[in-house]
Swiss-Prot record:
Name of the featured protein: UPF0251 protein Athe_2281
Family of the protein in this entry: Belongs to the UPF0251 family.
SUPFAM superfamilies registered for this protein in UniProt: Sigma3 and sigma4 domains of RNA polymerase sigma factors
Organism the protein comes from: Caldicellulosiruptor bescii (strain ATCC BAA-1888 / DSM 6725 / KCTC 15123 / Z-1320)
Lineage: Bacteria, Bacillati, Bacillota, Bacillota incertae sedis, Caldicellulosiruptorales
HAMAP family for the chain: UPF0251 (MF_00674)
Amino acid sequence: MPRPIRCRRVEFLPRFNYFSPREGSNDEVQLKVEELEAIRLKDLEGLMQEECAQKMQVSRQTFQLILEEARKKVADALVNGKAIRIEGGNYVFGNCKYTCLNCGKVFELDKDECPECHSSQVVCHRGKGRGHCFRHHRGW
């Protein structure tokens, strides 16, 4: 069984989530929310890859893979006249606290297991302005 994908932290949700050529086909590419965040941090903010990875709470390698996939999708849309729809992915907006369903421990790191009892039953804790992990979420 493959490892579950951890939620990537994003700090920005765009005002508009659909962009299309003035004239064009009905084809579109789906840009995940975390892919847009990678482009924003690296290309717009001009941060170093290490800083981007830290902000998104992923490894440098994972950040690089997210960024490459995002750039491919944007290039495909621009070169081939496709629309871009921004939605979905595995992300948490802002900071999130996690709760172990086994022992009740609350912690801030996005981990596959509880640091206290090592249970894999860990969920994003909703409460007081904390984020919620969106997994393959349509729209926002």
